[in-house]
């Protein structure tokens, strides 16, 4: 029996919880509709449930998972640099792109509130909960590890955007890592997403 089963396996239960939990939450988001609005679904799935697990199951302070302003001076600097560098790139790639226009035109309604709710939850999920949980075990490699599910969550979006997300996810993770906060990558991501919708739809 020992030959068949092999050596005894040992796992970090928090890593297992975050890995399995985040995978299931992403799948639930894809297959189910909890509320009439997708962004409220994501508040539940990507913010409330992870916070509940951190507080009740892990018995930890959410600050340990980037739920704070962290190094706010550095964060403001990265946010300004991110917005200034990405704005012309987004305008160049998104302006007149028919596939992006077709995809993003329906998202104009409710801006910027809808992207705010959507992305503050996404950023805590990837750049807070997953990143800082993995960083304890995997160190800097956590930056790439959290970028993988982030990139896969973009499948179905315009190709040029989806292909770039593994690198964008790493960059957002690096900002969160340096500032010890998910807030600053959220602000950059919020600007990028809102600006993409406005440019691709022809609103600006």
Residue locations for each model-derived region?
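Alpha-helical transmembrane segments in multi-pass membrane proteins
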Residues: 9-58, 78
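Membrane-embedded alpha-helical segments of multi-pass membrane proteins
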Residues: 40-52, 108-113, 121, 125, ...
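Short, Lys/Arg-rich, polar N-terminal cytosolic tail immediately upstream
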Residues: 1-9
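Membrane-interface helix termini and inter-helical loops of multi-pass transporters
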Residues: 31-37, 62-68, 94-106
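Function-critical hydrophobic alpha-helical transmembrane segments in multi-pass membrane proteins
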Residues: 48, 89-91, 101-155
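Functionally important transmembrane alpha-helices
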Residues: 28-31, 161-204
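Structural signal for the C-terminal ends of transmembrane alpha-helices
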Residues: 27-31, 53-63, 89-93, 175-178
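Hydrophobic alpha-helical transmembrane segments
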Residues: 12-20, 75-80, 108-112, 140-148, ...
């Amino acid at each position: 029996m020992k030959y068949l089963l092999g050596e005894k396996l040992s796992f970090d239960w928090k890593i297992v919880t975050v890995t399995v939990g985040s995978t299931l939450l992403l799948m639930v988001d894809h297959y189910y509709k909890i509320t009439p609005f997708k962004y409220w679904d994501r508040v539940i799935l990507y913010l409330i449930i992870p916070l509940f697990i951190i507080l009740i199951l892990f018995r930890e302070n959410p600050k340990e998972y980037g739920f704070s302003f962290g190094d706010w001076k550095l964060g403001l600097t990265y946010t300004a640099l991110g917005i200034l560098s990405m704005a012309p790139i987004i305008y160049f790639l998104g302006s007149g792109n028919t596939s992006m226009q077709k995809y993003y035109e329906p998202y104009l309604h409710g801006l910027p509130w809808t992207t705010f709710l959507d992305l503050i939850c996404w950023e805590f999920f990837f750049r807070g909960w997953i990143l800082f949980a993995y960083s304890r075990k995997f160190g800097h490699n956590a930056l790439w590890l959290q970028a993988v599910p982030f990139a896969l969550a973009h499948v179905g979006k315009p190709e040029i955007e989806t292909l770039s997300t593994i690198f964008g996810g790493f960059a957002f993770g690096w900002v969160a890592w340096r500032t010890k906060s998910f807030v600053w990558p959220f602000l950059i991501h919020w600007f990028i997403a809102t600006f993409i919708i406005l440019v691709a739809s022809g609103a600006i």
